């Protein structure tokens, strides 16, 4: 995998004007995705980004991704395929998976990373039967099966660690837009954050101005 798949991905990306385009997915897979019926349970992008899908394995993998920038390749195969169950449009699901990977992963936008996510939607693969309601003919990797192959308690301990390995107590002075953004980011990364602000309302002075009649 280190030799063959890496070189395969490098050549694939080199040969494409738009390596992350949906048109790179093989025709049989696109046809299979188009034949899917309704029934997926859509979650918002922010819920998925913050690891709030409700799926124990997926949420742990996503938390590790945005806190540490890493995800084991075998887990990423399962992580990437799960997006298909949260979007009616498989193309949208693939681009959302690529966006998350590109934004948070240390190897985001790397050829192996791009091809790895697209593999989840049929790239470099063949059709499988029987047809699945969610994945169609594309290879399945359900999280409820994968979770039985690993020590989930140990995996969660690894991925839930705060960035830099230790949770710090951090104070942010100023509850304006920048202060709240910094506090939210540090909290997402596993640190204990306290915000101090002299204002009477959350959000600092930029959140609104009161007029004489009390409206904002």
Task: Report residues per predicted region.
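Structured ligand/cofactor/substrate-binding pocket environments in proteins
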Residues: 3-10, 66-115
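A short, basic/flexible loop-to-alpha-helix module at the beginning of a structural domain
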Residues: 163-168
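Glycine-rich FAD pyrophosphate-binding loop
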Residues: 171-173, 187-212
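Catalytic cores of glycan-processing enzymes that make or break glycosidic bonds
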Residues: 1, 16, 73, 81-82, ...
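Gly/Thr-rich phosphate-binding loop signature of adenosyl cofactor/nucleotide-binding cores
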Residues: 1-71, 136
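C-terminal, helix-dominated tail/subdomain
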Residues: 22-38, 43-48, 93-157
């Amino acid at each position: 995998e280190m030799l063959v798949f890496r070189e395969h991905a490098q050549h694939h990306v080199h040969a494409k004007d738009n390596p992350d385009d949906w048109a790179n997915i093989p025709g049989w897979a696109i046809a299979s995705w188009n034949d899917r019926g309704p029934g997926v349970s859509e979650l918002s992008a922010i819920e998925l980004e913050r690891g709030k899908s409700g799926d124990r394995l997926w949420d742990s993998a996503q938390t590790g991704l945005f806190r540490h920038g890493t995800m084991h390749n075998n887990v990423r195969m399962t992580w990437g395929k799960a997006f298909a169950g949260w979007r009616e449009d498989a193309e949208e699901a693939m681009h959302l998976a690529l966006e998350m990977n590109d934004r948070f992963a240390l190897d985001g936008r790397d050829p192996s990373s791009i091809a790895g996510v697209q593999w989840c939607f049929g790239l470099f693969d063949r059709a499988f039967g029987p047809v699945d309601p969610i994945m169609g003919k594309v290879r399945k990797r359900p999280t409820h099966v994968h979770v039985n192959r690993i020590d989930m308690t140990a995996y969660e301990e690894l991925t839930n660690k705060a960035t830099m390995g230790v949770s710090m107590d951090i104070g942010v002075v100023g509850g304006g837009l920048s202060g709240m953004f910094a506090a939210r980011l540090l909290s997402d990364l596993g640190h204990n954050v306290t915000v101090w602000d002299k204002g009477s309302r959350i959000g600092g002075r930029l959140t609104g101005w009161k007029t004489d009649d009390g409206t904002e």
